[in-house]
């Protein structure tokens, strides 16, 4: 038997205060009596996530989900994945809102006190926005990214025109290069550095 999740319909615009306790009644409640230790692990994972809701001055969206590595840095790749679990508790975790720190910085030119470590990380924005919508039914969010600001469309064209070696958003240079049959990419920038395919490819992996 698997873990049964009772997903609750909750609001999507709350701004949690990290100093308060995590209200676990607003989270999916797992039922898995054969292995209660796995349920404990589940709750421990949410506690860890709650500890990464961060408030910071000088950024477009605060609070946001922090990756727990460097306080002055955010990653597209990691934030996209965090959105996928934050969608189960949108009233508690600012997952989808955290994407605005990339949209507004890269596309709108808003000042930010954070570095975007690899701006050429895989752009799964459309995928995670859609998965968030399927879970929450938040049509206003879709209007915001697709119609009001056209963030997804604009990011596609921005990504296609990236120049290898540029380093506008952090000291880490872009490794992406558009080729006729795909992208020439680096192992770390593509997110494939811990896979047999990507390990040690040093910017010469063709997608």
Predicted regions and their residues:
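Bacterial N-terminal signal peptides
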Residues: 1-7
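N-terminal signal peptide c-region/cleavage motif recognized by signal peptidases
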Residues: 9-11
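Low-complexity, Ser/Thr/Pro/Gly-enriched N-terminal "stalk/linker" regions
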Residues: 15-74
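Long, well-ordered core segments of solenoidal/helical folds
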Residues: 45-57, 90-112, 145-167
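Alpha-helical support elements that line or immediately flank enzyme active sites
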Residues: 72-102
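Short glycine/serine- and small hydrophobic-enriched flexible loop segments
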Residues: 84-88, 127-134
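The feature captures the catalytic groove of carbohydrate-active enzymes
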Residues: 109-120, 157-207
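Inter-helical turn/loop segments and adjacent helix faces that build the functional surface
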Residues: 132-143
